[in-house]
Amino acid sequence: MKKYDIKTTDKETLRKWFYLMTLGRAIDEKAPSYLLQSLGWSYHAPYAGHDGIQLAMGQVFDKDTDFLFPYYRDMLTVLSAGMTAEEIILNGISKATDLTSGGRHMSNHFSKMEWHIENVSSATATHDLHAAGVARAMVYYGQKGVAITSHGESAASEGYVYEAINGASNERLPVIFVFQDNGYGISVPKKDQTANRKVADNFSGFKNLRIIHCNGKDVFDSMNAMTEAKEYAIANRTPVIVQANCVRIGSHSNSDKHTLYRDENELTYVKSADPLYKFHRMLIRYGRFTEEELKEIADLAAKDLKAANRKAMAAPDPDPSTVKDYVLPEPYQPQKYKEGVQNEEGEKETLVTAINKTLKAEFRHNPDTFIWGQDVANKEKGGVFNITKGMQQEFGIERVFNAPIAEDYIVGTANGMCRFDPKIHVVIEGAEFADYFWPAVEQYVECTHEYWRSNGQFTPNITLRLASGGYIGGGLYHSQTIEGALTSLPGARIVYPSFADDAAGLLRTSMRSKGFTLYL
């Protein structure tokens, strides 16, 4: 049964929706003027044509129970979710009081992390992995909510989107993947992306996955789809894909000129399909509002935008001297052996035994510690080198478990899980050997700049463990040392113990420190 329609939806709800859609469109249309005046908003991706689904995503989002991962076109989504026009403009013109990053991140990347509107990368759809990770934490800690992640249909060509959906369906995670399908990836038409007309159909064979199609241009169809998706995901603890059919009325962004690849007939059609125009006409045709009433709402939106712009323009600019702030949080300060030297007393242990014992000790110390990766939890086998032997037996499958052979998923879901609560610390076996880690470098990069990009609001507490530089003479794929390729990226601590006592001490410090550590 459909919950929302033009005849029965109460008037105050319709009034709120029309106000949000009108205000959002006014901001969207004003954004390019800031760049023309050299005031900022150097990157702007207009959302016009996606109005229905973006309004719906924001309306079903609950900041107390849900997590929202918007992409760079989701201006109306975050406005509908509760962000103000002023907060959106502060991001667009990169002010010091920008909630997303204090002016560090690209414009048109909106977040409010205290509300769980997450700070995401510009590398489109990488946040699908983070949504799966935070949903895993929601399940473990018993929070009845959903993670909503959004992007265009072309981003579904990325391998990590497949990894996220595959993992979410396998783990039965309450994630809503929203594909805003406008038919283009910049200038690349959908037919050059996939053979299916509806991209979500590429995933139709997945178990534990619901797929809902809706008209993303229509407010009511989108509201019904998102409401159904959320209710289903929570009730069944399974992921849902919502494929929303949209149009892109303008160019991809302010650096694109769509008249170079779209003909006049297409441009005429997308303008005629304008969701705001159609919603306006529908409200009048069904007698829910008069023209005068809608004009009053539009005038109020214009007035509010003017006030928001005035406040945002008066906000301070970022201080250039702070550019090196928030590269890495301060590490945990050890209580014993502060000089890194201790007396050799007691029985000597191998490096493997020292790591295994330290992992177990830290898991007892902090019940909010987790480990997963390849081959970490199979009966008596605890990884290729038995590093995690006995851990699942002692700490349970909820805290110690295997991951698919999907290195990006291993790292990305660790990032996401840490977003649920800063007390969470995650150890991951990033790959069988360091030599096989390269597919995860995309998420490694994400982890290195989360702290800086969020202006210190979030850092993934991850210890990424890799077996590196093996002495077995394994050649190209079992004996590589990879630290040289990764040390050029700020935002990660890299440790490489050579003795058992170093291995134990550095692992303990890594697991108690805030931030991202590569442990080789």
Predicted segments, located by residue:
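General beta-strand structural signal in soluble alpha/beta enzymes
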Residues: 46, 68-71, 100-102, 132, ...
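Conserved acidic/glycine
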Residues: 1-53, 59-60, 244, 249-398, ...
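Thiamine diphosphate
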Residues: 55, 115-182, 216-232, 378-458, ...
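Short acidic, glycine/serine/threonine-rich loops at helix termini
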Residues: 79-84, 159-163, 187-192, 224, ...
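Glycine-rich ThDP/TPP pyrophosphate-binding loop and its adjacent helix/strand module
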Residues: 116-306, 310, 314, 487-520
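Short coil/turn connectors at secondary-structure junctions
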Residues: 14-18, 39-41, 62-67, 84-89, ...
